[in-house]
A protein has these predicted regions:
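Structural hallmark of WD40 beta-propellers
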Residues: 1, 52-59, 101-108, 118, ...
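Conserved strand-to-loop turn within each blade of WD40 beta-propeller repeats
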Residues: 3-6, 14, 60-64, 109-113, ...
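A conserved positional marker within WD40/Gbeta-like beta-propeller blades
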Residues: 8, 64-66, 115-117, 151, ...
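Inter-blade linker and blade-boundary elements of WD-repeat/beta-propeller domains
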Residues: 10-50, 56, 66-95, 123-151, ...
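Structural WD40 beta-propeller signal
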Residues: 48-50, 97-99, 160-162
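Loop/turn-rich, solvent-exposed surfaces of beta-rich toroidal or solenoidal domains
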Residues: 91-127
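C-terminal transmembrane module of eukaryotic multi-pass membrane proteins
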Residues: 149-164, 169-175
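A short, acidic, flexible beta-alpha connecting loop/helix-capping segment that sits on the rim
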Residues: 163, 172-174, 181-183, 192-196
Length: 203
């Protein structure tokens, strides 16, 4: 899946897994307008990879300076649900953490305002109802970490395969690695610059 310049998410599927040169468009839906002419960047998205959750994705909505959770309703139509707010500029990147047995989800965002943010999504047992009688499970959204260590625009965030370490990169030319302590506080565990050798990752 990707977000086109016109704000449409387009989802493709390889109908024949033995021939990955051919992909078929299976769905398309709008998420909003792109950034204004005086802003750089565009939309971004990341899938929820959990095998035990319904199909979901988080989309960075450039012009709105937020990220939104999208998932399918009973008619298999994609709907905007929760909003990840609090950004002071265009959301350049989003990354949904792999869920390795956790009872909650983690989503990281990289923002033009120079901040890396981590959001925690926990199930709301009350659920919620949308127009048409569709009842869906909702998430309580909480920003549990907000870092400005890059002191510059942040462009990329990415989780490791277990969703326990987050990497971020920005215009300061550094990659920062973040990990939660035993108390649940997220801390920078390593900083790697372009001038550092491979041994920098072993610190």
């Amino acid at each position: 899946a990707f977000v086109a310049a016109d704000g449409q998410v387009k989802i493709y599927e390889a109908m024949d897994v033995t021939s990955l040169a051919h992909w078929t468009l299976i769905d398309s839906f709008p998420v909003g307008e792109g950034p204004s002419k005086d802003e750089e960047g565009n939309h971004c998205l990341s899938w929820c990879t959990s095998k035990f959750a319904a199909q979901m994705m988080v989309v960075g909505c450039a012009k709105d300076h937020v990220a939104k959770i999208f998932r399918q309703d009973l008619n298999n139509k994609w709907q905007a649900c929760e909003v990840l707010a609090g950004h002071g500029g265009v959301v350049h990147d989003v990354s949904w953490a792999p869920n390795m047995g956790r009872s909650y989800h983690l989503i990281a965002t990289a923002c033009k305002d120079g901040h890396v943010r981590i959001f925690k999504l926990t199930d709301d047992s009350q659920g919620g109802a949308l127009a048409g009688g569709w009842t869906r499970k909702m998430f309580n959204v909480e920003c549990i970490a907000d870092f400005a260590d890059h002191n510059a625009e942040v462009w990329r965030v990415e989780w490791n395969i277990t969703g326990t370490i987050l990497s971020s990169s920005g215009d300061d030319g550094k990659v920062r690695l973040w990990k939660a302590t035993y108390t649940g506080d997220w801390k920078c565990m390593s900083v790697v610059s372009a001038e550092d050798g491979p041994s920098a990752f072993l610190r």
